[in-house]
Every structure is written in structure tokens, then in C-alpha cells.
Curated annotation (Swiss-Prot):
Chain's gene name: STB5
Secretion signal span: none
Other comment: Present with 279 molecules/cell in log phase SD medium.
MF terms in GO: DNA-binding transcription factor activity; DNA-binding transcription factor activity, RNA polymerase II-specific; sequence-specific DNA binding; zinc ion binding
PROSITE patterns, alphabetized: ZN2_CY6_FUNGAL_1 (PS00463), ZN2_CY6_FUNGAL_2 (PS50048)
Species whose genome carries this gene: Saccharomyces cerevisiae (strain ATCC 204508 / S288c)
Keyword Nucleus: yes
Entry's localization field: Nucleus
Job description of the protein: Binds to SIN3.
Protein name, per record: Protein STB5
Broad class of the protein's primary localization: nucleus
GO biological process, one term: regulation of transcription by RNA polymerase II
Biased composition (Polar residues): 85-99, 155-198, 239-249
Amino acid sequence: MDGPNFAHQGGRSQRTTELYSCARCRKLKKKCGKQIPTCANCDKNGAHCSYPGRAPRRTKKELADAMLRGEYVPVKRNKKVGKSPLSTKSMPNSSSPLSANGAITPGFSPYENDDAHKMKQLKPSDPINLVMGASPNSSEGVSSLISVLTSLNDNSNPSSHLSSNENSMIPSRSLPASVQQSSTTSSFGGYNTPSPLISSHVPANAQAVPLQNNNRNTSNGDNGSNVNHDNNNGSTNTPQLSLTPYANNSAPNGKFDSVPVDASSIEFETMSCCFKGGRTTSWVREDGSFKSIDRSLLDRFIAAYFKHNHRLFPMIDKIAFLNDAATITDFERLYDNKNYPDSFVFKVYMIMAIGCTTLQRAGMVSQDEECLSEHLAFLAMKKFRSVIILQDIETVRCLLLLGIYSFFEPKGSSSWTISGIIMRLTIGLGLNRELTAKKLKSMSALEAEARYRVFWSAYCFERLVCTSLGRISGIDDEDITVPLPRALYVDERDDLEMTKLMISLRKMGGRIYKQVHSVSAGRQKLTIEQKQEIISGLRKELDEIYSRESERRKLKKSQMDQVERENNSTTNVISFHSSEIWLAMRYSQLQILLYRPSALMPKPPIDSLSTLGEFCLQAWKHTYTLYKKRLLPLNWITLFRTLTICNTILYCLCQWSIDLIESKIEIQQCVEILRHFGERWIFAMRCADVFQNISNTILDISLSHGKVPNMDQLTRELFGASDSYQDILDENNVDVSWVDKLV
């Protein structure tokens, strides 16, 4: 390590360099010369140079909390050249202290950046261990919205390897019974669940890579899951989930095969890398057993899901599901009940987890019950391996539920990955194509409609994720021949009307992106008049959707009696999609998507900028109203939409198309909502700081009665805030950063 240099003057040594880099070089991630009093980089740029000394080190507890929030990822070292990735040397049993049951004593390893020692010392309390069956050679470099404080080593190797010593592995265990069944069909209630066809690459027995330890622990898990309830020797009581990956243990030379090249295994490994939810649960007693949950509370979770989420994604047969759920006598031990298919168990737990988040947003659960969503997701993920192996329409349903739950992770990468898997599986199953006459004769009307609804649910989910991230969709509207959903009985007409509205809005968002923001839109050699004609045509379509839906709602409201109006107001507390405010908010947000700077129109004319500024203020007014009424879900979809509005407001301020003084309330409201996301959403907190600085500047101007003595200085402050905001977005790979540098 480089040390300080000393110059000898008059028999005395004087230090000429510092031990550690200056603050500016650290922030810019540049190599610092460490010269005294000013380093070469700062001297060259005329910047102030200060040496804060060694960065403060975090304690083990602080590191553990940071890893749970996703702020800290241990950096791995490169393997030595020529070293075999699968070493034949045995792992010494004395490398880690063992508890009475053979589990490794919890705590951080002193070699936490060393790959070999990491694999020897897997801890049940470490949230980033090999859970969900994560393979040791899986990449860790998953983009995160809250990784703004993480410094990634450019030379770090994302791969690590297990020692091939068979004695260090858990003895092989069989796959779940549902996986080993022959190719027959098991039915339960309204569900037909075909047993999976396992690829020839998949061995009959799967070798387990354990979560708790990789020494001689012979405990068997259920259905590929392993929950540690042991409390000896100070081990943690928090159960952690481990879904076993495939590995072939029949190789005579002691080496193990890689992940089989089949769709389910590849998708499982991908999910284990990107999705971090449902891995632990805090809903446990001191002895490690799960706490009891009131049955009525679980029923409320299910009801909340069908009142809110089901209207957007109608892939579940509501009547059949509720009838089957009514036969469950013990929800808490459902994961051990062999009388129900694994896919049904997964759906029950995940639907309750999603319903819990809905009631949590509406303020209808106590603070102690808020952690139940993670506990229920934990129970659902115990069946994830069996679900992903099916590779059928049931897999699509379960992945959609998992995708909806992933919205509440403080990152968009997991939902983006899930949406890609869903859409490719959907296309592979041919769900985007209308059934032929021959197939329709062999299917009931209920089965055909269920198939169509699964596709449109997948379509809405994938379009929602893509448009929120500002990315291209995986399927074009011209490749879809499936008819729209239709009501099979009277009671679901209202729900299906909302579903059709969501489909039209998703289609509209996709059309705007394709014709205005896509790369192909920017390559067209069009005149200004032709570009304006495209935007005007899309504006007309959007206005028609809004007008038609507004008229439908007015007509329906006029036909309601007093009892129906009271019931409707109660439903609106849970499902906000029926409110006029939500419809106006979505209308304004799509107008922003249409008029903001784009590939088609990089520099909008002044009249378009004025229209854009008006829709920005309208969209924010409606967003803040929903927020105050507890109708705004605090998930990453809301965050990205908020950032898009913030981005547009900032652009309009720099272009002086929004009055600076009149926008001070909206700017402060931006700060309030961004900060309400909480400490887990560090990315949102940093963006809030930028807008707080803008709000302070506007406040100073308003106190001076609108007089700006130095307009150039104000412009520089706005441009500086814009650059700072763009830098935060760039650091986190956030694609809402669509504005070019303003010069």
C-alpha cells in the first residue's frame, strides 16, 4: 500500500503526501496524487482540496443492516491465474465454529472478501447467502435503485466456486413428490395441474447447496426448502429459505455439473439472483416456530387482493379459487399439506401477501401486522421450485403474482427480469394467439376465457414495467390476436370493465413509446409538420379514451342507488382505480409521456413546452391528492412515475415554461412524497435532497417579492440541480433520465 512521502529539511523530515485520497477525488472516483496541500487533480481544476482522512468503518451490525437494505454488497477478489475453479482440496472442518447441530455459528467471517472462506462459512443470519437455491457461480451484479452508496470494484470477479469435496455438501435429497410424478394430470377444485416433464439433463436426485451450512448436516427440507428453527449456541431464530438448485452428484471424479440447460433451471437461477424478497421472516417466536395468525385477518388479505389487484390482472379464476380456499382448515400449515397442489399453495400465500400490502397502504393493518406480507411471501417461496418446473400456464399465473409482489422491492430490476420471463413463457405457450376452431371445440368456454385472461394479465404487467422504466416492450401489438376479456357472469362485469380500461391505457402507453420515444422514431426523416401530426394523432386517441371512460363513469354513478354508492365509496378506499382523481392523474401522466423531449421531438417548440408544463402541474396535483388520501402505493412504479414528473418539472423550469414562484408548492410536495418512501429507499432520499435545494432557492426568491437580482446565478443553480439530479439517476442505472445535458 502506498505510504506517505517525506522530504528532509535541516535534519527534519516533512511529509509531502497524505495517506488517503482527498474528498473530491473520492466523490469523483479518481486516482488521487495525495500531494500536500493540494492534490494534482484539484490543483488542475482549481477546486478546493481537503483530506478528511480514513473513511469511517462500519460495525458488523451496521454492515448487516446495510446488506438487508441492499446498500452493501461484499466485493469478491479475483481468482489466481491457473487455479482450478473446482479445487480438489478438502475443506478443513475446523475452519468455522460449529454449533451443537452442526450449523455454523452466526457472525461475519474475518475473510468476508475471500471466496474460499465465504463458501466455507455460510451463515443463517447472512441475508445474501445462497438462498432460494442461488448458485455460487451466479452473478451478483444486479442493478438496484438503492445502491447509491455501494462502490463496486471494476476488477471484481462475479464468479465464485464451491470446493468439490463431497463431504462438505449436504447428502442428496429427492426432488418434491410433485416433481417426480409421471406425466399425468392432478386436479384440485377448479385447477388442473399437470405434473412436470423433467428434462433428461435433470438428475433424479438433486444435490443440495445448503443455506445453514455446508458441513455434514443431514437434515432434510420439505420440497426443497430448509428452515432452521434451532436456537442452540446463539444461532438466529429468523428462518431463511433455501430452494435447492440442480447439481449432478454422480460424477466419478468428484466434480459437479453446472445448471442443466433447460428453461426451468435457467429461470430459477435468474430469479435467485434478481429477486430478494420472501427470503426471511420475522414472524417467529423465541423457540423458532411461526407465530399464529388470525384466520379473519388472512381472509381480509384475500378479499383485498380481489377488490384491488384482481381488477388489473384477472389471471385467477376468482370463484374457483375462493371455493378451494374455503376448504383450507389451517392456513399456517398449508405448505405442509400434501392434499393441495404446490401451485395452489403458492398462489394462496402470495395472494395474501399482496393483499396485506394493499391494506397496509390503506392503513387497515396494525404496525405489528405489517411484516406479515414478508412472512406470507416467505411461505409462498417454499413452493417456487415446484412451480417454475411446470413451465405451463400455472407457472405464468404464479410468476405474475410474484411480479406484483416485487413492485414493493426498492428496485425495478427484479420486476423487469420477471416481466421478461413471463412474456417469453407466454409467447412460448402461444397465449398471444387466438385458439383455432379445432382447439375451441375441445375446450370449454371457461377454459378458453381463462387462457385469454392470463395473456392479458401478462400483457398489462409487462407493459406497466416497460413504460415505467422507459424501455421497449417484449411483444408488439400487431403480434396479438387474442380477443379482449369478456364477463362470464353478471357480477364480474364491473371488474372486466376496469380490466379493459387498463388494457387500453397499457396499449396507449406502448404506442406513445413506439412512435415517439423509440430509436426507430428518431431515425425517421420527418418534417416538423409530420412530427406534430403524429403527436396530435396520439393526443386525439388519448383524449377519446379519457372522454369515453369519464362518460361511462358518470352514467354508472347516475344509475346507482344510495346503498350502491356507499358500497362503492368503501371499495374506493382499497381500490383507487374507480376514482376520478386517479383517472385524471393517469391521463396527465400519459400526456407528459407524449409531450416531453423524445427521440421524435428532441427540442419541443414553445407551445408544446407550455402544454407540458401545465400537464406536469396537473399530474402532480392529482398525485399528491392520492398520496394524502392514502391511495398512492409506495412501490417502485410510483417512485419512477414520480421521478418522471420531477424530471419534467426540472426541465420545464430550466426552459422557463413553468412559473418559478407558482411551482414552489409542487416542488415541496415532491420532496414530501420522495422522503415518505422511507430509509430503505436511499435513492429516493437523495433525489429529495436535490429538490429540497430547488425549493429553498424558490423560497428565497419569493421572500424577495419575486425580484431576482442575478438571473444568471439562478439559471446556473437550476442547471446545477439538473446535472446533480441526472448524476444520481446515472449512478443507479435509472432509465427515466431522458433529458439531454442542458447547455
